Amino acid sequence: MVHKKIKVNLKNTSYEVIIGKGVSLDKKIKSKFIYGKEILLISDKNIPEKKINIITSSVEDCGPHKLNSLKLKLNERSKNFTSVSKIHNFLIKKKYTRDSLIICIGGGILSDVSGFAAATYLRGINFMLMPSTLLAQVDASIGGKTGINHTMGKNLIGSFHQPILVLIDITFLRSLSTI
């Protein structure tokens, strides 16, 4: 498969965005980002189970590490501290450390919430994005904007926290409902 790699160069950091059909966690990515890590795989409940199983198996194949999964169903109303606290509570109970990694598989809201949780847990841990919606693939996953809503307005609380990698598999778009 031909994949397009785009390097996002920022003042203090950089990361790759890999785009294509069937983009996955290949050996190079696994050895660089996953091997030996404590990983929390956060996915949207709307992602097809088959897709989650493929990604989970791919992560499990890469050697010793701790892998846990958390499924969330979020919307604009639940893009708040309560949802971030669910992630923080999970990380704390499972004793995740500064070297841990969050892998987020979902749309823009889940990317914002899980990115904000990563930015604020232990003053910042790494996270990787696998956006599953068109808007998340072209907007929410690029630029490091993370955050949540407040009762007084949208996206009022947040942080810039860059992902270590963005994997955009365009086949996710097939699973979206049609209007």
What feature does the model see in each segment?
Residues 45-47, 107-110, 171-172:
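Short glycine-rich anion-binding loops that position phosphate/pyrophosphate groups of nucleotides
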Residues 9, 24, 115-116, 121-179:
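A glycine/threonine-rich phosphate-anchoring loop and its flanking beta-alpha core
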